[in-house]
UniProtKB/Swiss-Prot annotation:
This is Small ribosomal subunit protein uS11. Coiled coil: none annotated. HAMAP family: Ribosomal_uS11. Located on the platform of the 30S subunit, it bridges several disparate RNA helices of the 16S rRNA. Forms part of the Shine-Dalgarno cleft in the 70S ribosome.
């Protein structure tokens, strides 16, 4: 078995992709931002947890903003200029992530809500009593 330290590391290849899709998955606990090419191959990704936010701080709009900013900058290194945004989930970081992607310099051409809606599927979790 090859040692992790001695294993040859793959170099990141700079792809020239003009347009892409930003998938924002916003849950109650975290926000994940993945930027793909039009075929769905990942170009860049980031999440609130991967940036060092822990616990309840991951679910804040600020954490979502930082995650979107990091993914946007990484995608721009690959030559990306315009993106469509697909938002999924009920979390608090949805709008903050979209605004942050626009602020990095990426042109947002469309915003879609792709939150899955059950056709009376499984029973939802019980209501919280705080």
């Amino acid at each position: 078995m090859a040692n992790k330290k001695n294993a040859p590391r793959k170099r990141r290849v700079k792809k020239n992709i003009e347009a892409g899709v930003a998938h924002i998955h916003s849950t109650f606990n975290n926000t994940l931002v993945m930027i793909t090419d039009p075929n769905g191959n990942a170009v860049a990704w980031s999440s609130a947890g991967s940036l060092g936010f822990k616990g309840s701080r991951k679910s804040t709009p600020f954490a979502a903003q930082m995650a979107a900013e990091a993914a946007g900058k990484e995608a721009m290194e690959h030559g990306m200029k315009s993106i469509e945004v697909a938002v999924k989930g009920p979390g608090s970081g949805r709008e903050a992530a979209i605004r942050s992607l626009q602020a990095t310099g990426l042109e947002v051409t469309a915003i879609r809500d792709v939150t899955p809606v059950p056709h009376n599927g499984s029973r939802p979790p019980k209501r919280r009593r705080v």
